[in-house]
């Protein structure tokens, strides 16, 4: 074909969603270029793989491209988008490009408001342990692979399905997982929860007649859509009607021990190298898929026991010195987490309590988006009130305009009125290390949490407190 696509350009290539697709395309032999406002470890990795990276957005960056990939975060007046439109170069939404990758293999798409990244990583790890060598595209760095994407030689591609902009409706996988359905990104759905649930129903309708929907029946909203799912279903969770069900669940030494009861297979004893009952649910989804694909029980057990986690999902940085007057006076345990919705945060706090019983829990939290802070304000107050000490920053806007009474200071005031925790408020994440040093004690567990720039803080804490 004269117009065959050889060169694909990514606008915003340094993001986790875009970079994973770019890496797979590089490994498939395509010429890949991309731009972003700043360089980071992701862009450095892609450059080392052979992608051409430009820092800053400019029309000349798309020179020679046959297609330009954009995410919903890219503005329509971006100079590269304008240049592509002027030159009649196809502008391809990220989800459409992911759908094209899925057409090359059998797709396994992981959807849900919470837990997508961890569940996708668990599924990919279990299939890899079973010798299926899957391709994966994950919204976080799989620590064992050192990357958020990999091109495998097997028949399957495992990827996250993003409901935040309804782009998951572009995908046509053969296996789907829905972990849960919660009120988030409601602007996309006109603040109508029924529309959000309908989108998930439509997502299941993308399955072929031989496809399977793997659904967490512990979630009441997932349970409500069951009658509208027309394809075969595997139910998982703690619920009595789950076909893949966890029993005898115990937390020990930061790990979860349980037995997975399976409707069409023998029970299997699991040691999961992650804390928290929510991660037991995530592991059950992986067990359900692995069982369906005839992965051996020993391989399932090994993959879950050896799972090293995902970057910024309860990522442990180890012991960090408590420094006083230039001298170490004990140490605290540092954990970093991407949680930014009250439901996710509550699960992480519960996991920390289970993993570190009896220890004081200190949270440094950066709220993400003014709209989410407004929509979930009371739930934020409730979950933030459950920690022992709190450092709270201003909201990371993610491009949104401020909303009155939905900022960090408003949250701090509401927390003081609630009276269960006295927040230390700081305007920027740059102030977090000093604020933490004033409240942290020997033996504490410190969690840095949020989806914004606070992700850079734990590395600083680990470095700056060396003595």
Swiss-Prot record:
Domain of life: Bacteria
Keyword Manganese: no
InterPro entries linked to this entry: Mur-like_cat_sf (IPR036565), Mur_ligase_C (IPR004101), Mur_ligase_C_dom_sf (IPR036615), Mur_ligase_cen (IPR013221), Mur_ligase_N (IPR000713), MurCDEF_pg_biosynth (IPR050061), UDP-N-AcMur_Ala_ligase_MurC (IPR005758)
Keywords attached to this entry: ATP-binding, Cell cycle, Cell division, Cell shape, Cell wall biogenesis/degradation, Cytoplasm, Ligase, Nucleotide-binding, Peptidoglycan synthesis
GO biological process: cell division; cell wall organization; peptidoglycan biosynthetic process; regulation of cell shape
Compartments reported by the entry: Cytoplasm
Molecular function via GO: ATP binding; UDP-N-acetylmuramate-L-alanine ligase activity
Biological pathway: Cell wall biogenesis; peptidoglycan biosynthesis
Chain sites annotated for binding ATP: 112-118
Reactions catalysed according to its record: UDP-N-acetyl-alpha-D-muramate + L-alanine + ATP = UDP-N-acetyl-alpha-D-muramoyl-L-alanine + ADP + phosphate + H(+)
GO cellular component terms attached to this protein's record: cytoplasm
Enzyme Commission (EC) number: 6.3.2.8
Pfam family membership, one: Mur_ligase_C
Family: Belongs to the MurCDEF family.
Function: Cell wall formation.
NCBIfam families for the chain: murC
The name this protein goes by in its record: UDP-N-acetylmuramate--L-alanine ligase
Organism: Paraburkholderia phytofirmans (strain DSM 17436 / LMG 22146 / PsJN) (Burkholderia phytofirmans)
Protein's gene: murC
């Amino acid at each position: 074909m004269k117009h065959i696509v050889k060169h694909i350009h990514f606008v915003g290539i340094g993001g986790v969603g875009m970079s994973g697709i770019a890496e797979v395309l590089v490994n498939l032999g395509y010429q890949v270029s991309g731009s972003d406002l700043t360089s980071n470890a992701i862009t450095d990795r892609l450059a080392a793989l052979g992608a051409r990276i430009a820092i800053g957005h400019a029309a000349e960056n798309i020179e020679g491209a046959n297609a330009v990939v954009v995410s919903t975060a890219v503005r329509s007046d971006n100079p590269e988008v304008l240049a592509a439109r002027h030159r009649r170069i196809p502008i391809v939404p990220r989800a459409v490009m992911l759908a094209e990758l899925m057409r090359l293999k059998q797709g396994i798409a992981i959807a849900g408001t919470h837990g997508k990244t961890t569940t996708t990583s668990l599924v990919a790890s279990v299939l890899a342990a079973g010798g299926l060598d899957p391709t994966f595209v994950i919204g976080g760095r799989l620590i064992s692979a050192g990357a958020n994407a990999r091109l495998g030689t097997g028949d399957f591609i495992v990827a996250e399905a993003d409901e935040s902009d309804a782009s998951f409706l572009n995908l046509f996988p053969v296996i789907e997982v829905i972990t849960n359905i919660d009120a988030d990104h409601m602007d996309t759905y006109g603040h109508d929860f029924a529309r959000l649930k309908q989108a998930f129903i439509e997502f299941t309708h993308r399955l072929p007649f031989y496809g399977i929907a793997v659904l967490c029946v512990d979630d009441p909203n997932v349970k409500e859509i069951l009658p509208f799912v027309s394809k075969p279903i595997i139910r998982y969770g703690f619920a009595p009607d789950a076909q893949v069900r966890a029993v005898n669940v115990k937390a020990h030494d930061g790990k979860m021990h349980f037995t997975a009861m399976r409707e069409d297979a023998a029970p299997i004893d699991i040691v999961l190298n992650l804390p928290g009952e929510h991660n037991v649910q995530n592991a059950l989804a992986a067990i359900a898929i692995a069982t369906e694909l005839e992965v051996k029980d020993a391989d399932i057990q090994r993959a879950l026991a050896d799972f090293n986690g995902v970057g910024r999902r309860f990522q442990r940085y180890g012991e960090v010195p408590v420094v006083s007057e230039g001298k170490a006076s004990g140490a605290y345990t540092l954990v970093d987490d991407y949680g930014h919705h009250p439901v996710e945060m509550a699960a992480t706090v519960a996991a920390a309590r289970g993993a570190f019983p009896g220890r004081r829990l200190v949270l440094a939290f950066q709220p993400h988006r003014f709209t989410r802070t407004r929509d979930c304000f009371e739930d934020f107050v409730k979950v933030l009130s459950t920690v022992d000490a709190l450092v709270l920053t201003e909201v990371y806007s993610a491009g949104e305009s401020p909303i009155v009474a939905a900022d960090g200071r408003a949250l701090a005031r509401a927390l003081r009125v609630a009276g269960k925790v006295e927040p230390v408020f700081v305007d920027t994440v740059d102030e977090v290390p000093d604020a933490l040093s004033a409240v942290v004690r020997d033996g504490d567990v410190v969690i840095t949490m949020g989806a914004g720039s606070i992700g850079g803080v734990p590395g600083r804490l680990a470095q700056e407190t060396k003595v």
